[in-house]
Amino acid sequence: MKLVNIWLLLLVVLLCGKKHLGDRLEKKSFEKAPCPGCSHLTLKVEFSSTVVEYEYIVAFNGYFTAKARNSFISSALKSSEVDNWRIIPRNNPSSDYPSDFEVIQIKEKQKAGLLTLEDHPNIKRVTPQRKVFRSLKYAESDPTVPCNETRWSQKWQSSRPLRRASLSLGSGFWHATGRHSSRRLLRAIPRQVAQTLQADVLWQMGYTGANVRVAVFDTGLSEKHPHFKNVKERTNWTNERTLDDGLGHGTFVAGVIASMRECQGFAPDAELHIFRVFTNNQVSYTSWFLDAFNYAILKKIDVLNLSIGGPDFMDHPFVDKVWELTANNVIMVSAIGNDGPLYGTLNNPADQMDVIGVGGIDFEDNIARFSSRGMTTWELPGGYGRMKPDIVTYGAGVRGSGVKGGCRALSGTSVASPVVAGAVTLLVSTVQKRELVNPASMKQALIASARRLPGVNMFEQGHGKLDLLRAYQILNSYKPQASLSPSYIDLTECPYMWPYCSQPIYYGGMPTVVNVTILNGMGVTGRIVDKPDWQPYLPQNGDNIEVAFSYSSVLWPWSGYLAISISVTKKAASWEGIAQGHVMITVASPAETESKNGAEQTSTVKLPIKVKIIPTPPRSKRVLWDQYHNLRYPPGYFPRDNLRMKNDPLDWNGDHIHTNFRDMYQHLRSMGYFVEVLGAPFTCFDASQYGTLLMVDSEEEYFPEEIAKLRRDVDNGLSLVIFSDWYNTSVMRKVKFYDENTRQWWMPDTGGANIPALNELLSVWNMGFSDGLYEGEFTLANHDMYYASGCSIAKFPEDGVVITQTFKDQGLEVLKQETAVVENVPILGLYQIPAEGGGRIVLYGDSNCLDDSHRQKDCFWLLDALLQYTSYGVTPPSLSHSGNRQRPPSGAGSVTPERMEGNHLHRYSKVLEAHLGDPKPRPLPACPRLSWAKPQPLNETAPSNLWKHQKLLSIDLDKVVLPNFRSNRPQVRPLSPGESGAWDIPGGIMPGRYNQEVGQTIPVFAFLGAMVVLAFFVVQINKAKSRPKRRKPRVKRPQLMQQVHPPKTPSV
């Protein structure tokens, strides 16, 4: 039995440790070595950004020598009579080359010198210099959690970054992303992410990233790190005199891309160019990045990894330089952000069309909870966001190089980004015609070959999971052409096409806008020939829809946009069914060589469209969301709605029904309401079509014409529901930012909502909000509620219904750190317009219960009740009979807030003129008018399946076979005694398998199967040996008694 126990013990060890077969321990002591599959450290990223006082970046229209730049600035400032200025020296590797910017210091308050600079013909723009702070803090996680348990039990919060920061989260493998522990299919997790994605197949073919220049913009790299053999150059762009990595993040990123041993990278033979752009104190400046980007262009970098990001897509010098980089054929790969699962949290530059934006998944192919979601918010309020991320790949528990050697595991999209950057570097080395590789063609190959993940929408996964081998197949058959992202529009396909598939279209509704990205692999510049053509399929009722187009006049760099507005024709107002058609566009680019005498390359692309049409819903079921009056960072400082959330100082998610109000939108749809978005002033919608106008967290001002029209609309039956937020000038001054280093104040431009503007809108009905600031938990109609930094109602009509509660005075707490309880705070008001056919108005002082950003307890039930009231005039019994109902406040003892003096809202407002003094409205803009495309009907049947892998040049991926491995396969040797890590391979080529899952899993199970069979036979042998022996029967001699008394026999 001892032998049996030994075999069973071996079997258990093999079953529990099969994941680590072939791995070598990085530590010699079992007691000190943690489980290789998980770590007990979590990396928390905290960051901020401030404007450096008196320092400005002067951008020029071209590249000039230092002498010429100095001359331009001097001549411009001479006429302004500004004497106290100087050019700040920049001592870095690009100082000896011409540059397109300069950093100057001007100590003046009137900004006359800045205006004079901008008037100079050679100066393009003058913007403030920004100082960036990042803090990477390691925190102990719960060591009692088993290695194979999910780590999603912790609460993830949006970091709401002010700046570009490293996008790594922590260490440890997350093998499953379910929130609850449950029975699930387990499989062997490969050792290395490069082998998981089958990079070893390309290694065996002889491709290892050789002759490809890859840049890593991060925290540096040690000179003699054992994992790297081809570090071509290390440059320092900071004010510290070191090139080494004191934090480890840059080393990890470089290791994922090009490590040659232990935690193997994708391209071990690539030429590494290390750009140290962060100090050991985790500080950086915009100008450091600009200089480093210029140097990367000079060095003809092929691939650039940027595992940093921030929400400021209006940081013009940075964004412009990224465009210039990609225009110079640099393939930029960037992390999409770690602010998931909240929508509308994409980081720049990953959200740019010319950049490959990467999201994260775990090793079970689930979207990582931390990975930021789309849509882009550049286009709001008038348009609709683009599809991002582009692709997703492994970003949870990925192993990479440690700062002094060995391996560590980290999680975050800054981990997923170098995975794609390494894969791209490897792919570039496989292409024979290197001139065909550019930022567009590489992105086309990646998204066309990506594997779609089931049950995940387009704003979470982009085009799907990175597939390295399929991308290799496409690139090696590629011919320059244009393509689209997404490659089709199917408003009936759920969940992938969410939110488009969540609501059918109908006559009279706001047009549905789909923002498509055009990728132009033919050249850095291009154009759309003539206009796009709309061709409806008559057998599929395509003539029941009409489309309008808006598109880039010039496709640069490598990309552009095509916005398609889809609406229903009047003849289909009562029709229900599916309508289909397609759009044809032709893209032209200049010829590749001058020998073609100015001839253009052209590429024609088809965009299928499929929509579901229903009869126009009744007015009572139609809700109009006011997007036009919602503002968000960037560019202004619009503070958070919940002042308790100190780690998220800005309101930057767009305040859209498909971003941070997504859950509210989903709830309204489940209740049968149809929600449309208004991206124009109130003068641009037909109020007779809608039952309720929903205004939530509004920060914008109002045109006088809007106020007058809204009054008429409410008198004629339109209802109004307003969810407000705090506005207190004393608190606004208190929450301003102060930087001890730069002595710079950053003042809020408004409160959580623009209460002074709302009060002007409501004054005609004798309503208004106060400047009170309240917080607390309460119960309303048997529902637990939380009031998070809300305001109160200052005045309300006497014949209205008002609900009050008892709260803490949060304003007093913020200002004086004192606690006080206030009773009978009016928070909810309901009012019926007395005129016949008039609408209804509802006021509520807090929007956090609808906002996904920091919602603690939702109030969707309350929204349902309020919409029942506004749509049908029935006061909910739970509110009309509430014990908290009080007499409406007359406004005599309440204070309504005034606009804060010195605010800069006019700089970012669509309503106010930019001038000193009292705010003055701009002229009312014209309402957008769409030009519907002339249809070119087709009397043919539409394709049945719109989703097909985007076939570039009719490449059939299912029929393409990988080439045979090259004969010069690498020779591997075992590790020498004392050497840590994996195999050491001459030439940097790493052994692998054709199919990672088959190659790794089959030998393991075969070995385990053999062990089971062997154990079975051992058990049987031991049983046979231990069984008591059976005695042989002996022939007994007859006894005397038997002879005397014979045995009885049956009688017949």
Swiss-Prot record:
Effect noted on mutating residue 414 to A: Abolishes serine protease activity. Does not promote FAM20C kinase activity
Membrane topology: Single-pass type I membrane protein
Keyword hit for Repeat: no
Superkingdom of the organism of origin: Eukaryota
Cofactor(s) demanded: Ca(2+)
Keyword Metal-binding (UniProt): no
Compositional bias (Basic residues): 1027-1037
UniProt GO molecular function: serine-type endopeptidase activity
Cross-referenced Pfam families: MBTP1_N, MBTPS1_3rd, MBTPS1_4th, Peptidase_S8
Tissue: Widely expressed.
Propeptide residues according to the Swiss-Prot or TrEMBL record: 18-186
Gene3D superfamilies recorded: Peptidase S8/S53 domain (3.40.50.200)
TM ranges: 999-1021
Cleavage (site feature) positions: 186-187
Illness association: Spondyloepiphyseal dysplasia, Kondo-Fu type: A disorder characterized by severely retarded growth, spondyloepiphyseal dysplasia, reduced bone mineral density, and markedly elevated plasma levels of various lysosomal enzymes. Additional features include pectus carinatum, kyphosis, a waddling gait, brachydactyly and dysmorphic facial features. SEDKF transmission pattern is consistent with autosomal recessive inheritance.
Protein name, per record: Membrane-bound transcription factor site-1 protease
High-level lineage: Eukaryota, Metazoa, Chordata, Craniata, Vertebrata
